[in-house]
Design a protein with these regions (language model features):
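Accessory DNA-engaging acidic/polar modules
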Residues: 1-153
Length: 153
């Protein structure tokens, strides 16, 4: 897909795949404000929004696993991991569980959680891209979102 560069804000000239993998909180905040207007950018934002909430676990048998998002007492995301879907969840553990990787979780749960977006991107780099030190270039970000196999839609 030919992605449209932003023409506003702190991520001007970046495409939405880059933005959501750089700062998911900012992306979802802008979606909530309908900041992407109409036209191509709005369509792309809607598509990226759906994809970013449904990233498949890159496992041979993903139905046996789920993503655990662990929060501190203040509602800030502190850790993300993959756990066995059959494990017993302690009541009131401060965690939420999802079938897929959902980049919107830090924004949806902790509205003022500036660090949560980075926590989830670090997890994504480690677990999906298998490289904590990877630089998520324009090409890598766009190729990731262009590949439907990465998403459970």
């Amino acid at each position: 897909m030919l992605w449209t560069p932003l023409r506003f804000g702190k991520y001007e000239e970046l495409t939405l795949p880059e933005v959501v993998l750089r700062d998911p909180n900012w992306f979802f905040w802008q979606c909530g404000k309908s900041a992407f207007g109409g036209g191509d950018l709005a369509r792309e934002a809607g598509w990226i929004r759906r994809q970013a909430r449904a990233i498949k676990l890159p496992l041979e048998n993903p139905n046996l696993s789920e993503v655990e998002y662990m929060f501190d007492r203040n509602g800030k995301l502190r850790h993300v991991t993959v756990v066995n879907a059959q494990h017993n969840r302690p009541a009131d553990s401060g965690s939420i569980f999802r079938k897929n990787i959902d980049l919107s979780v830090p924004h949806e749960v902790g509205k003022q959680d500036c660090n949560g977006g980075q926590v989830i991107i670090e997890f994504l780099k480690r677990f999906v891209f298998c490289d904590e030190g990877i630089t998520l270039t324009t090409e890598i970000c766009e190729e990731f979102f262009d590949d439907d196999d990465n998403f459970d839609l």
